[in-house]
Amino acid sequence: MSGWPRIYYKLLNLPLSVLVKSKSIPAEPALELGLDTSRPIMYVLPYNSKADLLTLRAQCLAHDLPDPLEPLEIDGTLLPRYVFIHGGPRVFTYYTPKEESIKLFHDYLDLHRSNPDLDVQMVPVSVMFGRRPGRQKGEENPPLRMLNGVQKFFAVSWLGRDSFVRFSPSVSLRHMADEHGTDKIIAQKLARVARMHFARQRLAAVGPRLPARQDLFNKLLASKAIARAVEDEARSKKISHEKAQQNAIALMEEIAANFSYEMIRLSDRILSFTWNRLYQGINVHNAERVRQLAHDGHEIVYVPCHRSHMDYLLLSYVLYHQGLVPPHIAAGINLNFWPAGPIFRRLGAFFIRRTFKGNKLYSTVFREYLGELFSRGYSVEYFVEGGRSRTGRLLDPKTGTLSMTIQAMLRGGTRPITLVPIYIGYEHVMEVGTYAKELRGATKEKESLPQMLRGLSKLRNLGQGYVNFGEPMPLMTYLNHHVPEWRESIDPIEAIRPAWLTPTVNNIAADLMVRINNAGAANAMNLCCTALLASRQRSLTREQLTEQLDCYLDMMRHVPYSTDSTVPSVTAGQLIDHALQMNKFEVEKDTIGDIIILPREQAVLMTYYRNNIAHMLMLPSLMAAIITQHRRISRQEILRHVEVLYPMLKAELFLRWSKDELAAELDKLTEELLRQGLIAVKGDELHINPSRSRTLQLLAAGARETLQRYAITFWLLSANPSINRGTLEKESRTLAQRLSVLHGINAPEFFDKAVFSSLVLTLRDEGYISDTGDAEPGETMKVYQMLAELITSDVRLTIESATQDE
């Protein structure tokens, strides 16, 4: 590029460099999209805009991609490196330039015909300034339609800092030429496909237009389901039809979001400023699969785990910065207090009560509102656990909203609904101290403005955040496979509950929890906490801690928990240095070296972070515990032990393997333990390597408290086979509390009611007990004896003496 064009672009770039601060999606386009910079690259943009072209150029230069303003020279022919699909509108509409995109496509394809070694990568790129979807009434032109020069000037001036450059996966023109030919018809088809691609991309980034709130309410009131519920309300409460209708409108006001693009923009500015000061980084993985779903027209339902109130903001922030529409979020009604409620509502929150029982009008209004969101094409987010996890582990799923999602499918909508499980992880959760108090019996404090301000005042260095998108679950595919007859239940008017709905919803919920855990993220904090809590004195020398972290890291890298889980790429030493900056640990120095200590008052809180990744290390920890306690044991015996205990572990920690897959997984773990030198093999038997016994014992400690808890329940069941389920849960908790006091067990979830409730349900499902009691003492005693060999003698004596004391 030379002469006047260079001067023109330089002059135009002066105001753009001040006004525009764009973001690249994905963050590393060459790496994430597999672009080969040694091969020719040309860019395709939706319409003629020099502002878009220069914004693209800035991102290309920042990411070491070819400059779009520098032409491509191929076989002595100079061709522009960019193609505008559409000429774009003009200020003076009587002048319409001739479109050149088809000619350029044809020129590129023709060069491939004459040069068999040529392979140009065609990269579609869209540049967006602002993402306001507009309202369904009163706005003729949505802001993302093609803008003329004057309109573009104002868009760039006002929205230049809310802009992004979206790179799409490249298309091989060599493949196009070989498969479809190089004539002009193919060039026209290529341009048409590109137009459709950009239209879909705009919809994925902006979402459908927003309804006027009153119009939405009127439409809901006109639905047959709500009309019938209003009549029932009037009849059952002996009130007028108008009063019942007012009640329905009041419920809509309570529930419905009031989405505002300007509030999203403002919040993005505030959160960007806040995150950069509080977090040392937000790590996002597998976002491309969600962008692809949005591009393909799926109705996306985000299903994250729930760690903190911060989840609402973090996930919307991440999605917005991935070029996706922030979802409508189901938030607990407890968050609907001033000023948080109105703010959250404008950010897309719709509010849900803890229970729908006994209020048919409320459940009908909520279900119809949720169905309306789906039918209009808005993405939705809800926490399938129902509330925040107080222990750091996943809670048993609450299936009400999930059931309504499937009922929405049974209304006969055309867009496919896909559930996207999401693992959210933190190195610091601001509520963790409150969680520990609640687990010890303190009353949950009601959310309010003073509480929110106290929480905000405690925000300090929060370390790193993690958002990992798990394997999506297309609902239609799932139902086709598991309930082939599901289409017979489609009813566009009534919300029906076919016999297959409840068991299917339960299975989907359990599968989602497994997929959330599959996307787990190990980090400096949860790895260091796991190692230090494994030590009896909650302290290790720096060398011991480094060795233990190396053990965990190697285990997770060489035998990954799943293809979606993530492990830090840095060294153990770097992880320790980072964790020490979080000010959770103490360091004592002596003449020999550093001792890293987890203070007693912090130990209970740090179990939360350990529990975030307990599932990722449970199987290797259990193997290590079996080998450590037996000293010498065959592979077959290890498999037998694991197969007996696995159903309980799977239900408690939502582990991913079926029983048939255990043998292969244990073989891989055995090879890794041998590779690390933690164990040795003699014949068919595995035994401890004395020189690495401390590392193996610390690894085994990850299963210690779980095995103790199982031993408690199986001992009580063996001692009193006729005990009923409720009593078994209660006595197990009482004995667990006693054990925690006598043996210094710091984990508050050790005697958590939900953990024992889940365990007892699994024992029923596995046939150890019936609903009325009547356990088979022979079987339960066998399992107890197996567990007794895996726990220390002092703990075993405490457990066995409990029933004797009675």
Swiss-Prot record:
Membrane topology: Peripheral membrane protein
Free-text note regarding domains: The HXXXXD motif is essential for acyltransferase activity and may constitute the binding site for the phosphate moiety of the glycerol-3-phosphate.
One annotated GO molecular function: glycerol-3-phosphate O-acyltransferase activity
Family the UniProt entry places it in: Belongs to the GPAT/DAPAT family.
GO biological process, one term: fatty acid metabolic process
Keywords: Acyltransferase, Cell inner membrane, Cell membrane, Lipid biosynthesis, Lipid metabolism, Membrane, Phospholipid biosynthesis, Phospholipid metabolism, Transferase
Keyword Repeat: no
Gene name for this UniProt entry: plsB
Disulfide-bonded cysteines: none
Organism, as annotated: Enterobacter sp. (strain 638)
Record Pfam families: Acyltransferase, GPAT_C
The enzyme's E.C. designation: 2.3.1.15
Protein name: Glycerol-3-phosphate acyltransferase
Pathway where it operates: Phospholipid metabolism; CDP-diacylglycerol biosynthesis; CDP-diacylglycerol from sn-glycerol 3-phosphate: step 1/3
First-listed, main subcellular location of the protein, grouped into a coarse class: membrane
The UniProt record lists the keyword DNA-binding: no
Protein localization: Cell inner membrane
Motif HXXXXD motif mapped to chain: 305-310
Catalytic activity: sn-glycerol 3-phosphate + an acyl-CoA = a 1-acyl-sn-glycero-3-phosphate + CoA
Superkingdom assignment: Bacteria
Gene Ontology CC terms: plasma membrane
